[in-house]
Amino acid sequence: MSIVWTDTVKQIAGVELHLTRGGSGPAVLVLHHDIGSVDRLPFYDALAEKFDVLIPHHPGWGKSQRPPWLRSPRDIAAIYAWLLADLEVSGVSLIGLGFGGWIAAEMASLAPRDYAALVLVGAAGIKPDEGEYIADQAIVSYIDYPKSGFHDEAAFARIYGGVSTDQLEAWDIAREMSFRTAWKPYMYSQTLPHLLGGVRAPALIVWGDDDRIVPLSAGRAYARALPGAAMTVVPDCGHFAEMEKPDALAKLAIDFLSRK
């Protein structure tokens, strides 16, 4: 089945927000990593065979405009809640990838009854166990940071090939936005764990067993914080599960969302 994807620009909070949309069925909002979004991933196509898939570029990332006032993932969460209201879609499920998982968790905490389901994949936003840390982009190169998110370096090469100048520039911008919105404390919220207990949406936590960016202990913390959450660990998989193990992640997500 060939999925038709459309690209539009929405004006939200004075920001030109780029939105890719495809498929049909119940709505699913997919929120991308801190390194930005790769267009037309097989994972997205698999979701779009069952769902109406919405993939925005975070404000300041990719093709979306940078708001000078943006300072936190919670700001981005509010923008996306506004986007969904303008699109007049309801009963939306959220899939958050890495940094996007943090945003999805913030959305769910702000509107505990509004979302049909929550899938967090290697999500930032919660502090790992004592002695463990979320990988710091500031101390590695633009290429080494995304590479470290793959269990198998061949998977990185399959997605990115020979890294272009345009890609390096996109990672540079993404890194700047990550620092602007998640610097102190770095990549986690001191308040979020205390606010997730009110979330009514069923939640699935997915983690790669070799995630070297966000430690597995953060996933376990999410599973404890979200009432009744299920957790699955994907073998031979790093942080970027949607790129490294698209079939496995798509099956997990589709099976979970189809039960809701």
Regions found by a protein language model. Name each.
Residues L54-I95, K251:
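Active-site loop/oxyanion-hole signature of alpha/beta-hydrolase fold enzymes
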Residues A229-K260:
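Catalytic active-site module of serine/aspartate enzymes centered on a nucleophile-bearing elbow/loop
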Residues R212-A218:
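Conserved alpha/beta-hydrolase "acid-adjacent" motif
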Residues D129-A135, I143-A201:
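Conserved alpha/beta-hydrolase catalytic His-Asp/Glu region
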Residues W102-L110, Y115-K147:
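Flexible "cap/lid" loop of the alpha/beta hydrolase fold
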Residues V199, I205-W207, D211:
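Short beta-strand/loop motif that positions the catalytic acidic residue
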